[in-house]
Amino acid sequence: MKIIAGVDEVGRGSLVGPVYAAAVILKKSINTKLLKDSKSISSSKRKVLFSHIKKNSIWAIGKASLTEIDQLNILNASLLAMKRAIKKLKQKPSHVLIDGNKLPNIKNYKLKSIIKGDQKIPSISAASIIAKVTRDKVISDLGKKFKGYNWQKNFGYGTSQHLKAIKILGITKHHRKTFSPINKLK
């Protein structure tokens, strides 16, 4: 029997915090018609689906830290987060479908990259939702400690409000030091 895991990452373009990835093996009982790319679903619906997916799947989260992002670059850090998520699954999948066009370096797994997989493959869509809700909560909680950057709404992405806050308040220890415009402000 084929056991398929879907994998996606979130946070690559953010100026703040770790990059997260999720790996999800869906149970047959889940209604896959509800699953779409996390970016195309409202925040409230994502949270409902997050709970539903967690109850109806085997799932795991992987992340790469700020230090790893700055040392490896964002692409390699994203692939590392994916590898960690796959390895943390409680059941080894026979096939792993990954959103995008790059694959992590991981032995003894059958991997396949799928461009726009988060829009085509339910298990990748589910991984997208798990990763996004998880990361959004972490960054939102950080925003409560680092007021003024509006991370509860922009989740660390380079919105005009966030960039203005950086100019006024400066960078924090949670900003990615190798990312523009952060690297110009050090």
What is each stretch, according to the model?
Residues M1-K186:
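RNase H-like, Mg2+-dependent phosphodiesterase core
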